[in-house]
Amino acid sequence: MRIFISTGEVSGDLQGAMLIEALKRQAALKAMDLEIVALGGDRMAETGVSLLGKTPKIASIGLIEALPFIMPTWKLQRKAKQYLQENPPDLLILIDYCGPNVAIGKYARKNIPQVPILYYIAPQAWVWTTNKKTTQDLVNITDHLLAIFSEEARYFAQKGMSVSWVGHPILDRMAQAPTREEARQKLGIKPDQTAIALLPVSRKQELKYLLPVVCQAAQQIQEKLPDVQFLIPLALEDYRSTISAMMEEYGLQGTILDGKSLDALAAADLAIAKSGTVNLELALLNVPQVVVYRLTPLTLWIAQNILKFSVPFLSPVNLVVMEEVVPELFQERATPEQIVQESLDLLLNPQRRQKTLSDYQRVREELGEVGVCDRAAQEILDYV
């Protein structure tokens, strides 16, 4: 079976790699030959698939922020479309990455209509959408959706899409996570030392808009807790020099960790994190967190006043139960002072900390059961 997979972002690369490994396992059980070509990143490349192009470095959120990546994205899109036209796969799998993947899906539906399109991890149109067109586009291009949230499955089923709920793949990843004690031993952190994970960057724009404010907050926390150790997992090697320079500028006691993100999360007493999949990882590890995010003022104004964009929450942890489990500091609220206030309260207030851990249990119950990637892989291989 020949499969083409398309995804973007650092998180999409991770989800894609986990799915590919599961596809290989399930194909071996069925004695099925498998050939996979993909758009993705380094993690997917490490699985041994043929990578047509790398997408994580050209990922962005926001309108103005996306401008520098329009041409690289367009070139990669053109390359993918040409490949699909010349080498139609048996199956096309799209993973999240709304704009580019919808464009690829539309092209495939029109030019190679015989190829089934499966969407794994749909864009969050079930939470937000600027208009009904986003949802309708997804319905039009998708033969079957493998949903990771139960509400996602209900939403798209109501719109007429063929859907199955497989659960969230983060459960499979976190099943391999070390305990707090194991992670601290591996990283050389004393059992009683305060450790804080800083997770502000997975996209280039966040080096400018998020990293400085998080480092300023970390500096203030360090002044109040002199023994604190900061742990910064590296999303992409390209970001190392900027992060290192920023840590030096603010005199932060910490370590940049390459390839040890789960160790950093598991070892932490608290995390200061951008909104994204990492919020769910922290919840599953019972690590309290402060979620922060910033866009350019112009992007925010356009989104609110022209596109009429609104969303109840930013973090998937809060979206899963539709209430604030973790504090979200967005835009003008994402100040060093606010971050410090929320962080110290979560660290030093036992009642607040226990409430967070209790709420995490409710989030966990909404994510399904371990074995997500294998269930998804079985459905994919049985589809054709």
Curated annotation (Swiss-Prot):
The keyword Glycosyltransferase applies. Transmembrane segments: none annotated. One of its GO terms (cellular component) is membrane. Pfam families: LpxB. One of its GO terms (biological process) is lipid A biosynthetic process. GO terms for molecular function: lipid-A-disaccharide synthase activity; phospholipid binding. Pathway: Bacterial outer membrane biogenesis; LPS lipid A biosynthesis. InterPro entries: Glyco_trans_19. It catalyses: a lipid X + a UDP-2-N,3-O-bis[(3R)-3-hydroxyacyl]-alpha-D-glucosamine = a lipid A disaccharide + UDP + H(+). Keywords: Glycosyltransferase, Lipid A biosynthesis, Lipid biosynthesis, Lipid metabolism, Transferase. Its EC number is 2.4.1.182. Condensation of UDP-2,3-diacylglucosamine and 2,3-diacylglucosamine-1-phosphate to form lipid A disaccharide, a precursor of lipid A, a phosphorylated glycolipid that anchors the lipopolysaccharide to the outer membrane of the cell. NCBIfam families: lpxB (TIGR00215). This is Lipid-A-disaccharide synthase. It comes from Gloeothece citriformis (strain PCC 7424).
